[in-house]
């Protein structure tokens, strides 16, 4: 712990690396405190703005992103986004009353978010609550599993409702018309919990196109799929140094780098996220940076997304050697080149070469070779008198002054 605190992880809010490799915030009197984290699946991404208020209760706002529910204008930032602040536990009745006076004990990040809380009730009653929050691996939904446990000395009456809330978005603002956003509570029950007994229920936040069938999600199956995915990231390409903070940083970077892939109509597309960049690819973020990483991780979905991105850029090879677009957006049907040539061909040549070398697949390398050759020839044709490839801007896209050649 002393080593962790010296490296900045054990901060004033008592975040620590736990025995399983996750990060746990042990909540004490130093509240309120808020933070945020993004988690993604193939058809959804969610930024959780979470924290503990001055009274010790959990705060949560879900910023939901559906990358394939496209809005108008269908540009780089046209993923449907909505925020949901619904506190699911407000719907729970305990001993005929609302569930009040929550005290959060700890919050753990491990590829899911696990929140442990307690409620003190009259007559030596005490209730424990575990929230497990995570995106579906393959469905357009964010999932929440709730476990209520009687940790007191007297029986507790618990009533869990079923609930379904539907929002239909403005059809004039959607590429495919109106979208349906469905929030549900599942697991309706009324029962007595004896000391030591527990019950579970769940909530989901899903988004659909008008003609899509609503899904009935099995929360345990969804959780297992997420845990299996995270275990695959966690157990492969393990960084082992004398510094546990660096090891943990790398482990979480693997999760974020690999989970942020979306199953678009243009194929699997990795996206930076951040409530801005989805269902699109960039010559720097994807072609140059993340794609060569996936073969080392051994993540087949990542490898497929890498090959898909290079195939998209290959569409723009041309005999006149005009620049490649900086990004291919909107599920692959449009491009953005607003900063001119950022040195994008050099980025693609470098990334595609490294990907081919690290993947070690001759057939894929032969498929990529024409793109690599074209990009290198483009660079050769644009060398300046100092032997540097000329470009209009760099990756910062004129946010700062750029010259005529930008490394």
Predicted regions: what they are:
Residues 1, 11-248:
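Terminal accessory carbohydrate-recognition/targeting modules of carbohydrate-active enzymes
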Residues 131-133, 159-162, 203-205, 293, ...:
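Glycine-rich, histidine-containing beta strand-loop boundary motifs that form or position
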Residues 192-217, 275-279, 325-347, 377-407:
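The feature captures the catalytic groove of carbohydrate-active enzymes
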Residues 147, 353, 370-373, 377-380:
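A broadly conserved amphipathic alpha-helix scaffold signal in soluble, globular proteins
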Residues 231-367, 374:
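Substrate-binding groove/exosite segments of carbohydrate-active enzymes
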């Amino acid at each position: 712990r002393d080593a962790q605190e010296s490296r900045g992880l054990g901060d004033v809010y008592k975040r620590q690396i736990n025995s399983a490799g996750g990060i746990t915030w042990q909540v004490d009197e130093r509240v309120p405190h808020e933070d945020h984290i993004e988690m993604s699946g193939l058809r959804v991404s969610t930024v959780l703005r979470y924290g503990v208020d001055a009274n010790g209760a959990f705060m949560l706002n879900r910023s939901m992103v559906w990358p394939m529910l496209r809005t108008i204008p269908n540009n780089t930032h046209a993923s449907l986004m909505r925020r949901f602040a619904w506190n699911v536990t407000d719907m729970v009745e305990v001993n005929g009353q609302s569930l009040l006076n929550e005290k959060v004990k700890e919050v753990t990040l491990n590829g899911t978010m696990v929140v442990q809380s307690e409620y003190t009730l009259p007559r030596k009653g005490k209730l424990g609550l575990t929230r497990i929050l995570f995106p579906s691996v393959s469905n357009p939904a964010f999932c929440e599993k709730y476990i209520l446990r009687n940790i007191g000395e007297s029986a507790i009456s618990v009533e869990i409702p079923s609930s379904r809330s539907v929002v239909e978005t403005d059809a004039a603002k959607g590429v495919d018309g109106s979208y349906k956003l469905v929030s549900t509570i599942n697991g309706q029950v009324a029962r007595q919990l004896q000391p030591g007994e527990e019950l579970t229920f769940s909530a989901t936040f899903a988004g659909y196109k008008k003609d899509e069938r609503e899904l009935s999600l099995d929360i345990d199956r969804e959780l297992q799929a997420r845990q299996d995915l995270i275990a695959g990231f966690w157990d492969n390409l393990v960084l082992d140094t004398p510094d546990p903070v660096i090891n943990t940083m790398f482990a979480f970077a693997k999760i974020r780098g690999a989970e942020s892939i979306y199953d678009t109509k243009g194929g699997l597309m990795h996206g930076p996220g951040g409530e801005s960049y989805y269902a699109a690819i960039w010559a720097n973020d994807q072609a140059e940076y993340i794609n060569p990483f996936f073969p080392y991780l051994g993540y087949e979905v990542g490898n497929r997304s890498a090959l898909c991105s290079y195939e998209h850029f290959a569409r723009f090879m041309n005999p006149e050697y005009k620049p490649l677009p900086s990004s291919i957006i909107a599920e692959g049907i449009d491009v953005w080149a607003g900063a001119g040539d950022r040195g994008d061909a050099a980025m693609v040549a470098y990334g595609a070469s490294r990907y081919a070398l690290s993947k070690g697949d001759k057939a894929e390398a032969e498929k990529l070779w024409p793109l690599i050759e074209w990009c290198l020839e483009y660079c050769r044709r644009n060398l300046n008198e100092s032997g540097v490839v000329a470009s209009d801007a760099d990756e910062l896209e004129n946010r700062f002054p750029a010259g005529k050649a930008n490394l």
